[in-house]
């Protein structure tokens, strides 16, 4: 059996629409082994929305590897242990795709390079901002081109924390993407280019005082926040409590605030405020560090049947 741990991820990070993302220390575990025949899929918790047949996203990701290398198991047993909440903007689908590809590559003897796995994951996901950090960890700036993902990975220091606000409702990425306009104004494109560049500079140099400006966006958040009750309240609460910036995580509905080494004070201020605020949704709150490793294998036993 092969056991793979794959992190959650947050995409866009404000202005970096479809090209920036960071891996977070919240994990799914994928356990796979070859069996004599058939396909057996189990999950914990046992969520009925998770397909238990060939439509399962982890299986589909694994099959892309088998198709690519021309090797197929006789049968598969897949067990999914999920901590990443579904359809909350924290990269649950990217974790399934990147983790499935990573596990399948191990199962077939490591025939694909890391670059090839990164490309397959981004191609299946449609964009690299979640799938690439899920695969390799860290803060990633990436673009998907023909047959290749061009990217830069930055190791995020432990002093930068990610305060994650997770509501008690789901929001599908497809719906949140369809609400976006087909065309944008030139000035809004210029606005985002400047902020995305500033964000990259602020993070890589440690100049976190630039983050309030660098996390502003005009391409997706003004439209998507209409789908998220309490969005402005949560963002304003975060900034008033000392966050360096706050933004929608991926397509939402989760919201992330960036905090520094004073995160314990921030955490207490937020918890006190949440207890007294009049909010439409119920919001879970946790503080996470970046995961700089990405998908990792932590258990390998005998995985292949005699042929």
UniProtKB/Swiss-Prot annotation:
One of its GO terms (cellular component) is cytoplasm. It catalyses: L-homoserine + ATP = O-phospho-L-homoserine + ADP + H(+). Transmembrane segments: none annotated. It is found in: Cytoplasm. One of its GO terms (biological process) is threonine biosynthetic process. Its EC number is 2.7.1.39. GO terms for molecular function: ATP binding; homoserine kinase activity. Pfam families: GHMP_kinases_C, GHMP_kinases_N. Gene3D superfamilies: 3.30.230.10, GHMP kinase, C-terminal domain (3.30.70.890). ATP binds at residues 85-95. Pathway: Amino-acid biosynthesis; L-threonine biosynthesis; L-threonine from L-aspartate: step 4/5. Signal peptide: none annotated. Keywords: Amino-acid biosynthesis, ATP-binding, Cytoplasm, Kinase, Nucleotide-binding, Threonine biosynthesis, Transferase. Catalyzes the ATP-dependent phosphorylation of L-homoserine to L-homoserine phosphate. Belongs to the GHMP kinase family. Homoserine kinase subfamily. HAMAP family: Homoser_kinase (MF_00384). This is Homoserine kinase. The gene is thrB.
């Amino acid at each position: 059996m092969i056991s793979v741990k794959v992190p959650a991820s947050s995409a866009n990070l404000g202005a970096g629409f479809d090209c920036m993302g960071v891996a977070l220390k919240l994990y799914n575990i994928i356990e796979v082994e070859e069996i004599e025949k058939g396909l057996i899929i189990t999950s914990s918790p046992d969520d009925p929305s998770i397909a238990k047949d060939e439509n399962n996203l982890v299986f589909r990701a694994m099959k892309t590897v088998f198709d690519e290398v021309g090797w197929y198991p006789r049968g598969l047993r897949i067990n999914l242990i999920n901590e990443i909440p579904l359809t909350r903007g924290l990269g649950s689908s990217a974790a399934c795709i990147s983790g499935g590809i990573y596990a399948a590559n191990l199962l077939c003897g490591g025939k694909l390079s890391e670059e090839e796995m990164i490309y397959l994951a981004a191609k299946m996901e449609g964009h690299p901002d979640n799938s690439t950090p899920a695969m390799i960890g860290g803060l990633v700036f990436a673009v998907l081109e023909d047959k290749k993902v061009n990217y830069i990975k930055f190791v995020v220091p432990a002093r930068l924390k990610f305060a994650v606000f997770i509501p008690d409702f789901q929001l599908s990425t497809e719906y949140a993407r369809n609400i976006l306009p087909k065309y944008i104004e030139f000035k809004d494109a210029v606005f985002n280019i400047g902020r995305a560049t500033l964000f990259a500079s602020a993070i890589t140099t440690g100049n976190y005082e630039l983050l309030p400006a660098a996390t502003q966006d005009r391409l997706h958040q003004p439209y998507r926040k209409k789908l998220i009750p309490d969005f402005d309240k949560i963002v304003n609460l975060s900034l008033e409590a000392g966050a360096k910036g706050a933004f929608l995580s991926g397509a939402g509905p989760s919201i992330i605030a960036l905090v520094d080494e004073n995160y314990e004070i921030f955490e207490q201020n937020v918890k006190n405020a949440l207890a007294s605020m009049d909010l439409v949704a119920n919001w879970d709150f946790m503080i996470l560090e970046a995961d700089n490793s990405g998908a990792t294998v932590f258990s390998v036993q005998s995985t292949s049947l005699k042929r």
